[in-house]
Amino acid sequence: LGSWSVWIYDVMFKLVTSYATVIALHDRLYKKNNGHVISSSTLDEKWLQNFKEPNLKKIKFLYVARINPEKGIYEFLEMFKKADLGAEISIIGKTKSLTLHKKFQSLIEGMENINFPGYISSRESLIDAYDKHNILVLPSFTEGQPYVVDEALARRRPVLIFEDIAHIIKGRRGIFVSKRDLE
């Protein structure tokens, strides 16, 4: 079809959307009157109310994600131990297998400054967790559009990420990029 395929697509898109209500994730994708722009986020008004000031007397990291290798949590915990910042970290999430769970448990065993409440499904409890910490850490090796970043920023908490996923910043303020080594 070659260059005709673009023309055919354009005609079909105009034909179909002229008689339909279009739902898009960004206003750049569809600007007509018969469309709606929605947010793919789980944020609602509760996330934007009753802000609590962070307690800055002690560094309190928060990790909210699956506890899987691609999320970089194992490497981050090794760095966390070596850095010996006198900080705390709470890890909210679950593993996808018993093997990974055992590996994770052996890694945090005996570490008094690591809190592992597990998976939290309650929105109120999750908001409370963000409020009790002062930095969200997202050590992932790869990410698309992580909603935990929006959650942390909604609760006015900065986010620490690594160079691998610097593309997620997208003009947002409050996201800080670090190298993955302590030197």
Model-flagged regions — what are they?
Residues 141:
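Aromatic "clamp/platform" in nucleotide-sugar-dependent glycosyltransferases that forms part
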Residues 127, 146-154:
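Short alpha-helical segment that forms part of, or immediately flanks, the ligand-binding pocket
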Residues 154, 158-161:
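Short hydrophobic beta-strand element within catalytic cores of glycosyltransferases
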Residues 2-51:
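A short, active-site helix/loop in glycosyltransferases that binds the activated sugar's phosphate group
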Residues 119, 128-133:
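Short alpha-helical donor nucleotide-sugar binding micro-motif in glycosyltransferases
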Residues 64, 88-102, 116-120:
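Glycosyltransferase donor-sugar binding loop
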Residues 174-182:
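Conserved acidic donor-binding segment of nucleotide-sugar-dependent glycosyltransferases
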Residues 59, 66-82, 99-102, 127:
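A conserved mid-protein helix/loop that constitutes part of the nucleotide-sugar donor-binding site
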